[in-house]
């Protein structure tokens, strides 16, 4: 059975790909779940248009991610004032992704989603310089230098 995928399917293909599958797999799994449509000339044209649109969107997203990367790198090290214990210098709590996003925004950087900030495996619980990764695009990550300082 020849089908055109309408969603990414593991070990089979991505949106717009024309695939040949066994009849039972197509009829009982892919078609009822809306993961594929039966291949025809009209459906193939539609799939080609979707694929072209996705490729142009990917290029636009990559360009936008490069612009954001340049803006973040231009900021340099970002200061993040936090409340600390007076005697030990340890933080009350830890630095979160939302704190990092707010610090970038306050430093004059772009507004980011906290879900794209990748904190180190060990929590940031001490004053000092820490490095945080920002995942802008599947091909682009930005390393941000974060200076955690005691709030005065």
From Swiss-Prot:
One of its GO terms (cellular component) is ribosome. One of its GO terms (molecular function) is rRNA binding. The keyword Oxidoreductase does not apply. InterPro entries: Ribosomal_bL9, Ribosomal_bL9/RNase_H1_N, Ribosomal_bL9_bac/chp, Ribosomal_bL9_C, Ribosomal_bL9_C_sf, Ribosomal_bL9_N, Ribosomal_bL9_N_sf. Transmembrane segments: none annotated. GO terms for biological process: translation. SUPFAM superfamilies: L9 N-domain-like (SSF55658), Ribosomal protein L9 C-domain (SSF55653). Keywords: Ribonucleoprotein, Ribosomal protein, RNA-binding, rRNA-binding. The keyword Nucleus does not apply. PROSITE patterns: RIBOSOMAL_L9. Pfam families: Ribosomal_L9_C, Ribosomal_L9_N. It comes from the Bacteria. Coiled coil: none annotated. NCBIfam families: L9. Belongs to the bacterial ribosomal protein bL9 family. Binds to the 23S rRNA. PANTHER family: 50S RIBOSOMAL PROTEIN L9. This is Large ribosomal subunit protein bL9. It comes from Mycobacterium tuberculosis (strain ATCC 25177 / H37Ra).
């Amino acid at each position: 059975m020849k089908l055109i995928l309408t969603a990414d399917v593991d070990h089979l293909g991505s949106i717009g790909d024309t695939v040949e599958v066994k009849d039972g797999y197509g009829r009982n799994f892919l078609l009822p779940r809306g993961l594929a449509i039966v291949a025809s000339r009209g459906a193939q044209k539609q799939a080609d248009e979707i694929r072209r649109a996705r490729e142009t969107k990917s290029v636009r997203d990559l360009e936008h991610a490069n612009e954001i990367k340049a803006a973040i790198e231009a900021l340099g090290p970002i200061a993040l004032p936090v409340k600390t214990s007076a005697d030990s210098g340890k933080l009350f709590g830890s630095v979160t992704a939302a704190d990092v996003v707010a610090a970038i925004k306050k430093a004059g950087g772009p507004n980011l989603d906290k879900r794209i900030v990748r904190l180190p495996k060990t929590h940031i619980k001490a004053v000092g310089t820490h490095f945080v990764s920002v995942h802008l695009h599947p091909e682009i990550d930005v390393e941000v230098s974060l200076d955690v300082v005691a709030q005065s």
